[in-house]
């Protein structure tokens, strides 16, 4: 199979398909960090949405469409008003346009002529602005002791079957009372920039990557 991994600089999923003998290519505006530039297209993925591929698996940026993005869409003093009557957030006046552009990008990926399509994103605005996901999964369903709620919108590929259900992993608690999965808290402690934190949040666990490669390429 010829598989396009959209918005994947890490090449975790790309390499999982390559191990099974498939012609998989990652594509991202960033250079790859997975060690195989010969399998990486550093370019705008929308230039490659054509019938040369058998499947596209996309990991679009969630900055403007994750659940946490909702708080920045409107002025905090306008919560009592209907959404369409609320003013833009004073700190982020362009957030609504950013959200709309992000959703349009997802739709462009989903509606491509590629026969099989999978879109991965966290719980967020796609569910309300588009449609509910076909499946919600966790790393602990595929052998990785960690929690990271992940939604899948599928056109062609079947729902993934759990491969190895394990513990849900530890959590790190903070003085504020909030907590993060330990894998995420530990990784955040090592990062210095916003860009590094974004890459950490987009982490694909190996069990999930292997499940996609093994089950969707049959």
Question: What do these predicted regions represent?
Answer:
Residues 1-218:
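Conserved active-site and SAM-binding loop architecture
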